[in-house]
Amino acid sequence: MRRYIYILQKGNLFTPVTRTDDEFVEILKSGQVRIERIVSEGHVSPPGFWYDQNEWEYVAVLQGSAELETLNGKIRLDSGDWVMIPAHEKHRVSYTSSEPPCVWLAVFGKE
């Protein structure tokens, strides 16, 4: 039987970043689920690049705004909005706010 040992940890989802690229911070990885905080300051997916992940993804915008593009159109996300992206749903980030920075909470999982 596999056991996971967790220790009490504290963090702040709104800790400022000073980077020139998106910042990805893994908060939890356990079995079939992982949670990340992503901070984007005006960053977008490279031209022609599409995510095609083998995991489902729940993503919520905690601060700022963003726009995702799928093969079926664009989805605007403002602070408090979330979207559930099925595995292998091709998508890309076409906009993120820079002031304030876009802070995402992403939960990934496998069936």
Please give the residue ranges for each predicted region.
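A short, N-terminal "cap"/entry segment at the start of jelly-roll beta-barrel domains
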Residues: 1-50
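Short histidine-centered beta-strand/loop micro-motifs
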Residues: 25-27, 46-53, 70, 75, ...
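A structure-centric signal for secondary-structure junctions around beta-strands
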Residues: 32, 55, 101-102
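Short, conserved beta-strand element in jelly-roll/cupin
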Residues: 52-67
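A generic "structured core" feature
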Residues: 56, 82-86, 108
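Structural motif
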Residues: 65-67, 74, 90
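Short acidic-glycine-tyrosine-enriched beta hairpin
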Residues: 72-87
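Ligand-binding loop in jelly-roll beta-barrel domains
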Residues: 88-111
